[in-house]
Amino acid sequence: SNTSHQDFHSFYGTNLMIGG
């Protein structure tokens, strides 16, 4: 991932949805 913002949402967002 190039952008930190996108990585944050892509990784964090998915983690929250999966792991909560």
Swiss-Prot record:
The keyword tRNA-binding appears for this protein: no
Keyword Transmembrane helix assigned to the entry: answer is no
Tell me where in or outside the cell this protein is found.
Mitochondrion inner membrane
Q: Which GO terms describe its biological process?
A: oxidative phosphorylation
Q: Which GO terms describe its molecular function?
A: cytochrome-c oxidase activity
Q: What is its EC number?
A: 7.1.1.9
Q: What is this protein called?
A: Cytochrome c oxidase subunit 7B-liver, mitochondrial
Taxonomic classification: Eukaryota, Metazoa, Chordata, Craniata, Vertebrata
